[in-house]
């Protein structure tokens, strides 16, 4: 079968969710949690076919009896055995494809250590026998998905937040900034402030409930102090949420106090700058001639940028930091939760990209180091 007829696979491995599918599609076919679960107790039902590990949604649904681990922390793979399980699950259970028949485009965090790219490359060629592969930087793909080649991407997922300035399709590594504050930290913070209200959430299973509350009810206030005043003086901002056991809880100012930590990391006891300042600092590390293009093409990407009100707040905060005459445009595509994957789907289906793949033959000749020469 000719190389041209085979759809490439696009796999975006995030700290929280894995997004996978076929190049040319407009959305990923499979989206599942990047988790591997192992039973906490010895099985007693012989012949029940209990497995020694579960991946993704199955691990999620059996979370009550499992210990859940995330192999990707802060955007970077830290446990390769579990990562291999996630890839195996992606190919064979989710996409139901034979990896040796398809080129594979993987994504990586900005500033991913060199050894990690090599390890990814090695596993793809040696364990899964893929015919060809490529590794692309997540934020760059998000920018492609928005139809741009120049701009600054604020990519905030579950494990890490990055600001990545990109000029004519190339990320500018000296100006990339990383903030170890993302969705998982906000979920933990939400657990903490709900405890103050008298609701107790402690286990890994309960954390998932809190994550759902966060995703459904939180929003970013345009003016935090003013919103706190409104919340204190009326119940207009209160919402209720039904827990799996039928108990109904009410939340008020937690709805916007939780994501406010993105702008004020001191809420989490962190000394870092907020996402608005980090974006500004990233722009200021770039050449003075390209800053205008970055201010006017600030693209939001990733699940933790999905809060209602976040774009308006970013606009307000960056306008306060930037020169007064500067035109500032915050782009918040509705599909930004999946824009990294969508960008990968676009890239892998371009005819001009086909010569960019690292082939099995090149890998066999040069070894894992080939990835640094071909993927930049």
UniProtKB/Swiss-Prot annotation:
Pfam families listed in its UniProt record: Actin
GO cellular component, one term: cytoplasm
SUPFAM superfamilies linked to this entry: Actin-like ATPase domain
Main location: cytoplasm
EC number(s) reported in the record: 3.6.4.-
InterPro entries per record: Actin, Actin/actin-like_CS, Actin_CS, ATPase_NBD
Keywords carried by this UniProt record: ATP-binding, Cytoplasm, Cytoskeleton, Hydrolase, Nucleotide-binding
SMART domains xref list: ACTIN (SM00268)
GO MF annotations in UniProt: ATP binding; hydrolase activity
Catalytic activity annotation: ATP + H2O = ADP + phosphate + H(+)
Similarity field: Belongs to the actin family.
Role according to the record: Actins are highly conserved proteins that are involved in various types of cell motility and are ubiquitously expressed in all eukaryotic cells.
Name the UniProt record assigns to this protein: Actin-1
Organism: Schistosoma mansoni (Blood fluke)
């Amino acid at each position: 079968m000719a190389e041209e007829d085979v759809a490439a696979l696009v796999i975006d491995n995030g700290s929280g969710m894995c997004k996978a599918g076929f190049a040319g599609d407009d959305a990923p076919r499979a989206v599942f949690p990047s988790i591997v679960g192992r039973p906490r107790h010895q099985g007693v039902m012989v012949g029940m076919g209990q497995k020694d590990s579960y991946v993704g949604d199955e691990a999620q649904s059996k979370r009550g009896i499992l210990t859940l681990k995330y192999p990707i922390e802060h955007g970077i793979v830290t446990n390769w055995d579990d990562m291999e399980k996630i890839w195996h699950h992606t190919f064979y259970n989710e996409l139901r494809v034979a990896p040796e028949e398809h080129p594979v485009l993987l994504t990586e965090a900005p500033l991913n250590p060199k050894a990690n790219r090599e390890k990814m490359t090695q596993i793809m060629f040696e364990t899964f026998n893929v015919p060809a592969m490529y590794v692309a930087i997540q934020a760059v793909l998000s920018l492609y998905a928005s139809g741009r080649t120049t701009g600054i991407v604020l990519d905030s997922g579950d494990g890490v937040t990055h600001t990545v300035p990109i000029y004519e399709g190339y990320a500018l590594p000296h100006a990339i900034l990383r903030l170890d504050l993302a969705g998982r930290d906000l979920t933990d913070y939400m657990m903490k402030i709900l405890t103050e209200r008298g609701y107790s959430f402690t286990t890994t299973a309960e954390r998932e409930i809190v994550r759902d509350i966060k995703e459904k009810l939180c929003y970013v206030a345009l003016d935090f102090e003013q919103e706190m005043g409104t919340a204190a003086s009326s119940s207009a901002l209160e919402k209720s949420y039904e827990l799996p056991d039928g108990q109904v809880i009410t939340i008020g100012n937690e709805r916007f106090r939780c994501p406010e930590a993105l702008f004020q990391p001191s809420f989490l006891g962190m000394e870092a700058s907020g996402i608005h300042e980090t974006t500004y600092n990233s722009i200021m590390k770039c050449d003075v001639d390209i800053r205008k293009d970055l201010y006017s093409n600030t693209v939001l990407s990733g699940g933790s940028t999905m809060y209602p009100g976040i774009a308006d707040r970013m606009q307000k905060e960056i306008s306060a930091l930037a020169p007064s005459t500067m035109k500032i445009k915050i782009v918040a595509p509705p599909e930004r939760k999946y824009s990294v994957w969508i960008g990968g789907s676009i890239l892998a289906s371009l005819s001009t990209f086909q010569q960019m793949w690292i082939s099995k033959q090149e890998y066999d000749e040069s070894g894992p180091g080939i990835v640094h020469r071909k993927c930049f």
